[in-house]
Amino acid sequence: MHFTVCDFLLDLVQNSVEAGAKAVAVEVIEDGSWLAAEVTDDGKGMGPDELERAKDPFYTDGVKHARRKVGLGIPFLLQALEQAGGDYELRSERGKGTVFRFRFPAEGVDTPPLGDLPGFWLSACCFDGDYELLMKRRDASRGVAYELRRSELLEAVGELNDAGALVLAEAFLRSQEELGDEDEENERRA
C-alpha cells in the first residue's frame, strides 16, 4: 500500500533500477506551498504507447514480474495526485530514460505525508544492481538542503548487506535531516 510520498518514490526508483538505469536522481523539495519530487533515470525508457500503458493499473509487461497481473505504482500515484489537486509531468524516450516530476499542495487535506525520507533514501540505496543514486533535498521552511550520492555512502560504510553498515548509513542519513532542525533551534536561542 502507498501511504506516503516516500512509498511512491520508492516504487519509482525501483522501476528505474529494474529498467537498467545506471544513474538515478531523486529530488525532494518542500517550499511551503508544494511538496514536490522528481525522479530522473537513464534506463531503457518508454515509447509513447508504453508511456500511456504505464498509467493503466491493469497493465504490466509481464517481464519484470512474471506472475503479476497488474502494475499499480504509477496509477496509484496519479490517483493520489488527482485527489489532492496536485500535478505531474511524465516524459520518457526509448533508449534515453524517464523523468517523472510531481507535486502535491503542501496543505492539501488529501496530500499524503512525506513519510520517512531517510528510511526511503536507505531503501533506495539497497536495491541490487550497479547504479548511482543522487539524492537531493531542499526544505525551505526548515533550512534543510543537502545532496548525497549512493557511491559516497557505500564508500563510507561499505556494502549495505550487514547490520552495522545499515545502522551507520541510517544514522548518517537521519543526521542530514536534523541539521536544519539544529540551525532553527540555535536561532531561537540567540
Q: Residue ranges of each PLM-predicted region?
A:
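Short beta-strand-loop-beta element adjacent to the nucleotide/active-site pocket used for signaling
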Residues: 29-37
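Conserved glycine-/histidine-rich ATP-lid loop and adjacent helix of the Bergerat-fold HATPase_c
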Residues: 76-86
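A short beta-strand-to-loop motif within the catalytic HATPase_c
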Residues: 90-94
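Glycine-rich GHKL/ HATPase_c ATP-binding element in histidine kinases
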Residues: 96-98
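Short conserved segment of the HATPase_c
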Residues: 46-58
